[in-house]
Swiss-Prot record:
Protein name listed in UniProt: Aspartic endopeptidase PEP1
Keyword Signal annotated: yes
Cross-referenced PROSITE patterns: ASP_PROTEASE, PEPTIDASE_A1
Native organism: Trichophyton verrucosum (strain HKI 0517)
Propeptide residue range(s): 21-67
Domain annotation Peptidase A1: ranges: 82-400
Catalysed reactions, as listed in the record: Hydrolysis of proteins with broad specificity. Generally favors hydrophobic residues in P1 and P1', but also accepts Lys in P1, which leads to activation of trypsinogen. Does not clot milk
First-level EC class: hydrolase
InterPro entries: Aspartic_peptidase_A1, Aspartic_peptidase_AS, Aspergillopepsin-like_cat_dom, PEPTIDASE_A1, Peptidase_aspartic_dom_sf
Any one GO BP annotation for this protein: proteolysis
EC number: 3.4.23.18
Length: 403
């Protein structure tokens, strides 16, 4: 994961990447998510800390303390995690698809047995090509980490195969990853400039197979409380209602960045507000820049917007012990609407109830912080409310209500 301070270096190596040109192919495929029972449920501050660190933001001490001090709990029968099955080499792995990163890293037979137990493993064979002298390492805000070496191997999703895809094999993972048995790694779907392999970044799976696809795009239909799906190379119009509203993407830092002009909380004629405030939140006049990221669970916005939202939630407070905004679990939560190129994207209030922590519930909307130059993050809490098109032509991103 790339920090803000590293962006200059990342952009410098961008020109060394060889990305498949978006010439028209014929392939299209659907990838349904699958539900995997969770073996442990972490404190939501863990997800919050990872998101902040992922984008180079300072992790407040209260958030860090809550994340480090938490103990995984036994899940209920309804606790599930949604992953995507990907064939890596000779085996199938359950991976998280992450539009906020450019790495494809996996548990493997190189991962120590005490760290890989319970995971599906990538097994390099004689057909796998090790990239001598290449390595990768990632550290998250809750101090979870992973690292290892790099192979070129076949990676397949649906009917599309990348015959020489960089696969980052984990030779070490922290306890946080080892204990998360639901996932066997991560597949990054950002622009390839964010790939962290050294000494030379590698292309993402999407960029590798781009010329095979009918259209140079993918879509996601993530769901609240149930598995969603990804479609590559085409737009399934049965999955959305109404027209798709497109807006330009700023990929200068490797992310799927876009601009929202305004927001509203709840309903009524007096509920609409423009994004405003200090430039340290990326505001340009009445607009605000954000990043669409399937790899971030929460939605992270500026302090003033977050505070205004929770003023309308009875009993809500920024709890230092829990590391974020919490509220009574039976509290009525207002809808949150973003205006994007004239389209109103509505996040239902129920999506803002992320997870119970003791006698209260942790909010799906949290503060992005106040460090200079930090981006706003539109994570799964937002994305699960929309049908989203990620189009490399432009590039642009599109939104529509889910059917």
């Amino acid at each position: 994961m790339v920090q803000i301070s590293q962006i200059g270096a990342v952009l410098a190596v961008c020109s060394t990447l060889t990305v498949a040109a978006p010439t028209k192919g014929k392939a299209r495929f659907n990838v349904p998510q699958v539900a995997v029972p969770m073996k442990a449920v972490h404190h939501p501050a863990v997800a919050y800390a990872r998101a902040l660190h992922k984008f180079g933001m300072k992790v407040p001490k209260a958030v860090s303390d809550a994340a480090r001090g938490s103990v995984p709990t036994t899940p209920t029968k309804d606790d599930e995690q949604y992953v995507t099955q990907v064939t890596v080499g000779q085996g199938k792995l359950n991976l998280d698809l992450d539009t906020g990163s450019g790495d494809l890293w996996v548990f493997s037979t190189e991962t120590p047995k005490d760290q890989s137990q319970g995971h599906n493993l990538y097994m390099p064979t004689s057909k796998s090509k090790r990239l001598d002298g290449y390595s990768w390492e990632i550290t998250y805000g809750d101090m979870s980490s992973a690292g290892g070496d790099v192979f070129l191997d076949t990676v397949s999703i649906g009917n599309v195969t990348a015959s020489s895809q960089a696969v980052e094999s984990a030779k070490k993972v922290s306890d946080q990853f080892a204990k998360d048995k639901a996932t066997d790694g991560l597949m990054g779907l950002s622009f390839s400039v964010l790939n962290t392999v050294q000494p030379k970044p590698q292309t993402t799976f999407f960029d590798t197979v781009l010329k095979q696809l009918e259209k140079p795009l993918f879509t996601c239909t993530l769901k609240h409380g149930q598995p969603g799906s990804y479609d590559f190379g085409y737009i399934d119009d049965s999955k959305h209602s109404g027209e798709i509203a497109y807006t330009n993407v700023d990929n200068s830092q490797g992310w799927w960045g876009f601009t929202a002009e305004s927001y509203s909380i709840g309903g009524g004629s007096n509920s609409t507000h423009s994004f405003h405030g200090a430039q340290h939140h990326g505001a340009r006049g009445s607009s605000i820049d954000g990043i669409a990221d399937t790899g971030t669970t929460l939605m992270l916005l500026s302090d003033d917007v977050v505070q205004e939202y929770y003023k309308q939630v009875q009993g809500a407070k920024n709890d230092q012990q829990q590391g974020g905004w919490v509220f009574p679990c039976d509290a009525k939560l207002p809808d949150f609407t973003l205006s994007i190129s004239g389209y109103n994207a509505v996040v239902p209030g129920k999506f803002m109830n992320y997870q119970a922590v003791g006698s209260v519930c942790f909010g799906g909307l949290q503060s992005v912080g106040s460090s200079g130059g930090v981006p706003n993050i539109f994570g799964d809490v937002f994305l699960k409310s929309q049908f989203v098109v990620w189009d490399t032509e432009g590039p642009r991103i599109g939104f529509a209500p889910q059917a």
